[in-house]
Amino acid sequence: MIDGHTKLAGVMGWPVEHSRSPLMHNHWCRVNGVNGAYVPLPTHPHGFDQALRGLAAAGFQGVNVTIPHKEAAMLACDELTPTAKRAGAVNTICFVAGRIIGDCTDGTGFCDNLSAHDVAIAGRAMVLGAGGAARAVAAALLDRGCEVVIANRTLERAEALVEALGGGEAVAWYEWPSLLSGCSLLVNATSMGMGGKAGLDWDAALREAAPGLCVTDIVYTPRETPLLLAAQARGLRTVDGLGMLVHQARAGFRAWFGVDPQADRTTFDLLAASLRTDA
C-alpha cells in the first residue's frame, strides 16, 4: 500500500509501455519488504528536462531513463559519475540533496551478467554497433582489460567511438566475421534481432568463429534472438540479454531503496513469463 512514507522511483521513456522495469522493481520491493513503488513515466522528448526536475521536486528518489532520453539525461544532470562520463550516456538518476546525479549501469550490468554465467571477461571482444549501448559495453570491457574491436555499418561512428574511449580498434562492417577466429566474445549491441527479425545471415557470419567463442546479445525480446539461435546451432556458448536488464537494475534499486536485490530465479521467471505473454 502506498502511503506518506513510500519511496518512489520510475522509468522515463517515449514510449515506455514495453518496459519490464516496473515489474522487476516492484517485485523486489515486495520480496524485500520495502515500502516503495516504481512506475512507468511516459515522457515526451520536448518535455524531458522539465519533467525530470519536476520529479525531483516531487520527492522521487530517482529514475531510470530509456530510449530516447539517455543522452539528453546527461545534459540535464547536475553531476555525472565517472562511469556515466565514460559511457557517454545516463540510464540511472538519483535525486540527492536537490541535485540530479546521473550514472550509467549498462556496462556493469552487462559484465555482471557474463560473470553470473561463469564467462571469463578476458581476451578479444568483438562489439557490434557504435550507439549508446555499444559504448557502455565497450567501455566496461576495456576497463576490465579486454581487447575491444568495434564494428559498425558506418565506420566513421566506430572510429569516433574508439577515439572517445581512448582504446580499442574500429573495423569496417564487412570485416568483422573474418576476425571472429581470434575473439573470445561476440556482443551484439545493435537492435538487430529485436522482435525476432534477423537483420543479417548470422549463420554465415559465424563461419569463422573460434570453438571457444561466447556469443551474447543485449536484445532480450525474444530471449533467443536469431544470433543466439545461429550460435547454438554451431555449438557455441550463448548468453541472452535478460540478465543484463536485471543486473543493470540492481544498482539503481540499491541507491533508491537502500536494499541490494538478488538476481535470483524468481526474478528471471517473472520477467520470462511477461515476455511470453507479449510474444
Curated annotation (Swiss-Prot):
UniProt KW keywords: Amino-acid biosynthesis, Aromatic amino acid biosynthesis, NADP, Oxidoreductase
The EC class name is oxidoreductase
Kindly list the GO CC terms recorded for this protein: cytosol
Q: Which residues bind NADP(+)?
A: G129, A130, G131, G132, A133, N152, R153, T154, L155, E156, R157, I218, G241
EC number from the UniProt entry: 1.1.1.25
Query: Is this entry keyworded Transferase?
Result: no
Q: Which residues cross the membrane?
A: none
Reaction(s) this enzyme catalyzes, per UniProt: shikimate + NADP(+) = 3-dehydroshikimate + NADPH + H(+)
A single GO molecular function term of this UniProt record: NADP binding
Q: In which pathway does it act?
A: Metabolic intermediate biosynthesis; chorismate biosynthesis; chorismate from D-erythrose 4-phosphate and phosphoenolpyruvate: step 4/7
Gene3D superfamilies per the UniProt record, alphabetical: Leucine Dehydrogenase, chain A, domain 1, NAD(P)-binding Rossmann-like Domain
Pfam families reported for this sequence: SDH_C, Shikimate_DH, Shikimate_dh_N
Q: What does this protein do?
A: Involved in the biosynthesis of the chorismate, which leads to the biosynthesis of aromatic amino acids. Catalyzes the reversible NADPH linked reduction of 3-dehydroshikimate (DHSA) to yield shikimate (SA).
Q: Oligomeric state and partners?
A: Homodimer.
Q: What is this protein called?
A: Shikimate dehydrogenase (NADP(+))
